[in-house]
Design a protein with these regions (language model features):
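Short, compositionally biased low-complexity segments enriched in polar/charged residues
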Residues: 45-106, 121-122
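Generic low-polarity alpha-helical segments
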Residues: 1-12, 71, 76, 152-154
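Amphipathic alpha-helical substructures
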Residues: 1-66, 103, 117-118
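C-terminal soluble interaction/assembly domains
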Residues: 91-174
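Generic secondary-structure transition motif, activating predominantly at the C-termini of alpha-helices
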Residues: 15, 75, 79, 126-129, ...
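Compositionally biased, intrinsically disordered low-complexity regions
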Residues: 6, 25, 44, 56, ...
Length: 174
Protein backbone atom coordinates (compact mmCIF):
# COMPACT_ATOMS: atom_id res chain seq x y z
CA UNK A 1 0.00 0.00 0.00
CA UNK A 2 2.80 2.40 0.82
CA UNK A 3 4.36 1.97 -2.61
CA UNK A 4 0.98 2.69 -4.19
CA UNK A 5 0.66 5.85 -2.11
CA UNK A 6 4.15 6.92 -3.16
CA UNK A 7 3.20 6.31 -6.79
CA UNK A 8 0.15 8.58 -6.42
CA UNK A 9 2.32 11.29 -4.84
CA UNK A 10 4.73 10.97 -7.77
CA UNK A 11 1.78 11.16 -10.18
CA UNK A 12 0.49 14.38 -8.61
CA UNK A 13 3.93 15.98 -9.07
CA UNK A 14 4.55 14.68 -12.60
CA UNK A 15 3.58 16.04 -16.01
CA UNK A 16 0.59 13.68 -15.77
CA UNK A 17 -0.89 15.51 -12.75
CA UNK A 18 -3.87 16.81 -14.74
CA UNK A 19 -5.06 13.25 -15.46
CA UNK A 20 -5.88 10.23 -13.32
CA UNK A 21 -3.93 6.93 -13.12
CA UNK A 22 -6.99 4.85 -14.01
CA UNK A 23 -8.36 3.22 -17.14
CA UNK A 24 -5.77 3.15 -19.93
CA UNK A 25 -3.25 4.93 -17.68
CA UNK A 26 -3.49 2.31 -14.92
CA UNK A 27 -0.07 0.78 -14.13
CA UNK A 28 0.16 -2.78 -15.46
CA UNK A 29 2.86 -4.10 -13.14
CA UNK A 30 4.29 -3.63 -9.68
CA UNK A 31 7.53 -2.61 -11.42
CA UNK A 32 5.78 0.51 -12.72
CA UNK A 33 4.56 1.40 -9.23
CA UNK A 34 7.96 0.76 -7.62
CA UNK A 35 9.83 2.68 -10.35
CA UNK A 36 7.61 5.51 -11.67
CA UNK A 37 10.32 6.59 -14.13
CA UNK A 38 9.91 3.22 -15.86
CA UNK A 39 6.15 3.79 -16.00
CA UNK A 40 6.67 7.27 -17.44
CA UNK A 41 8.88 5.99 -20.25
CA UNK A 42 6.43 3.20 -21.14
CA UNK A 43 8.35 0.21 -19.76
CA UNK A 44 5.46 -2.28 -19.96
CA UNK A 45 5.85 -5.81 -18.59
CA UNK A 46 6.56 -8.68 -20.95
CA UNK A 47 4.05 -11.50 -21.05
CA UNK A 48 5.77 -14.82 -20.40
CA UNK A 49 3.80 -18.02 -21.06
CA UNK A 50 4.58 -21.70 -20.69
CA UNK A 51 4.61 -23.42 -24.07
CA UNK A 52 3.03 -26.66 -22.82
CA UNK A 53 -0.20 -27.19 -20.90
CA UNK A 54 0.99 -29.93 -18.54
CA UNK A 55 -1.50 -32.27 -16.88
CA UNK A 56 0.03 -32.08 -13.40
CA UNK A 57 0.05 -28.30 -12.96
CA UNK A 58 -0.84 -27.32 -9.39
CA UNK A 59 -0.58 -23.55 -9.90
CA UNK A 60 0.76 -21.06 -12.42
CA UNK A 61 1.12 -17.30 -12.13
CA UNK A 62 3.32 -14.24 -12.42
CA UNK A 63 5.26 -12.92 -9.43
CA UNK A 64 6.07 -9.42 -10.56
CA UNK A 65 8.83 -7.19 -9.23
CA UNK A 66 7.22 -6.57 -5.83
CA UNK A 67 6.96 -10.28 -5.05
CA UNK A 68 10.48 -10.82 -6.37
CA UNK A 69 11.71 -8.19 -3.90
CA UNK A 70 9.79 -9.90 -1.08
CA UNK A 71 11.40 -13.26 -1.92
CA UNK A 72 14.84 -11.61 -2.09
CA UNK A 73 14.26 -9.87 1.24
CA UNK A 74 13.24 -13.16 2.85
CA UNK A 75 16.30 -14.93 1.42
CA UNK A 76 18.50 -12.13 2.78
CA UNK A 77 17.03 -12.64 6.27
CA UNK A 78 14.73 -9.62 6.33
CA UNK A 79 11.03 -9.72 7.12
CA UNK A 80 10.22 -7.03 4.57
CA UNK A 81 10.90 -6.59 0.88
CA UNK A 82 14.32 -5.82 -0.48
CA UNK A 83 14.80 -2.07 -0.07
CA UNK A 84 17.21 -1.80 -2.99
CA UNK A 85 17.34 1.70 -4.45
CA UNK A 86 18.48 0.18 -7.74
CA UNK A 87 15.61 -0.92 -9.98
CA UNK A 88 15.73 -4.64 -10.57
CA UNK A 89 15.32 -4.47 -14.33
CA UNK A 90 12.51 -7.04 -14.12
CA UNK A 91 10.88 -7.46 -17.52
CA UNK A 92 8.38 -10.24 -16.86
CA UNK A 93 8.13 -13.69 -15.30
CA UNK A 94 6.10 -16.85 -15.02
CA UNK A 95 6.22 -19.71 -12.54
CA UNK A 96 4.54 -23.07 -12.38
CA UNK A 97 4.26 -25.61 -9.60
CA UNK A 98 3.92 -29.20 -10.74
CA UNK A 99 2.64 -32.29 -8.92
CA UNK A 100 5.19 -35.12 -8.86
CA UNK A 101 5.15 -38.46 -7.00
CA UNK A 102 7.94 -37.22 -4.70
CA UNK A 103 6.58 -33.75 -3.93
CA UNK A 104 5.93 -30.51 -5.80
CA UNK A 105 8.32 -29.06 -8.37
CA UNK A 106 8.76 -25.35 -9.10
CA UNK A 107 9.82 -23.99 -12.50
CA UNK A 108 10.20 -20.21 -12.68
CA UNK A 109 11.46 -18.02 -15.51
CA UNK A 110 12.30 -14.33 -15.14
CA UNK A 111 13.03 -12.14 -18.17
CA UNK A 112 15.25 -9.14 -17.44
CA UNK A 113 15.57 -5.78 -19.18
CA UNK A 114 19.29 -6.38 -19.75
CA UNK A 115 22.01 -8.94 -19.12
CA UNK A 116 23.50 -6.78 -16.34
CA UNK A 117 20.16 -6.91 -14.47
CA UNK A 118 20.08 -10.70 -14.74
CA UNK A 119 23.71 -11.03 -13.67
CA UNK A 120 23.20 -8.73 -10.67
CA UNK A 121 20.23 -10.84 -9.51
CA UNK A 122 22.11 -14.11 -10.09
CA UNK A 123 24.94 -12.81 -7.90
CA UNK A 124 22.61 -11.82 -5.07
CA UNK A 125 19.10 -13.29 -4.72
CA UNK A 126 19.84 -16.07 -7.19
CA UNK A 127 22.93 -17.10 -5.27
CA UNK A 128 20.98 -17.25 -2.00
CA UNK A 129 18.18 -19.22 -3.67
CA UNK A 130 20.69 -21.67 -5.15
CA UNK A 131 22.17 -22.25 -1.67
CA UNK A 132 18.88 -23.44 -0.18
CA UNK A 133 18.79 -27.08 0.70
CA UNK A 134 15.93 -29.49 1.05
CA UNK A 135 16.43 -33.23 1.49
CA UNK A 136 15.53 -35.12 -1.67
CA UNK A 137 15.42 -31.95 -3.79
CA UNK A 138 17.73 -30.34 -6.30
CA UNK A 139 17.98 -26.58 -6.99
CA UNK A 140 19.15 -24.96 -10.20
CA UNK A 141 19.34 -21.22 -10.79
CA UNK A 142 20.79 -20.42 -14.19
CA UNK A 143 21.10 -17.84 -16.92
CA UNK A 144 19.12 -18.64 -20.06
CA UNK A 145 18.24 -16.81 -23.25
CA UNK A 146 14.57 -16.36 -24.21
CA UNK A 147 13.87 -14.95 -27.65
CA UNK A 148 17.12 -12.97 -27.52
CA UNK A 149 16.43 -11.63 -24.03
CA UNK A 150 18.42 -12.17 -20.85
CA UNK A 151 16.53 -14.48 -18.50
CA UNK A 152 16.91 -16.81 -15.55
CA UNK A 153 15.42 -20.22 -14.94
CA UNK A 154 14.91 -21.51 -11.41
CA UNK A 155 13.99 -25.13 -10.82
CA UNK A 156 13.43 -26.58 -7.37
CA UNK A 157 12.24 -30.15 -7.71
CA UNK A 158 12.60 -33.64 -6.30
CA UNK A 159 15.82 -35.41 -7.31
CA UNK A 160 13.81 -38.09 -9.14
CA UNK A 161 11.58 -35.66 -11.10
CA UNK A 162 11.41 -36.77 -14.73
CA UNK A 163 11.18 -33.14 -15.84
CA UNK A 164 14.87 -32.57 -15.06
CA UNK A 165 15.66 -34.02 -18.49
CA UNK A 166 13.30 -31.68 -20.31
CA UNK A 167 11.87 -28.92 -18.09
CA UNK A 168 8.83 -26.97 -19.28
CA UNK A 169 9.77 -24.08 -21.54
CA UNK A 170 8.30 -20.63 -21.95
CA UNK A 171 7.89 -18.07 -24.67
CA UNK A 172 7.85 -14.30 -24.54
CA UNK A 173 4.64 -12.94 -26.06
CA UNK A 174 5.68 -9.29 -26.02
Amino acid sequence: YLDGAEFVIWWERSVLKDSTPYGVRMPTSTEQILSPARYERGDAPLTVRFTTAGSDVLHEDTMGEMELRIVDGHLAGRDSRNESAVPYGWGGDRYRTIRTPDGPALVWYVVWDAGRDRDRWLGQGGQRLRALGRPGYRHTVEAVDLAGRAATRVIIAPDAWIGWNSPPGVGVVR
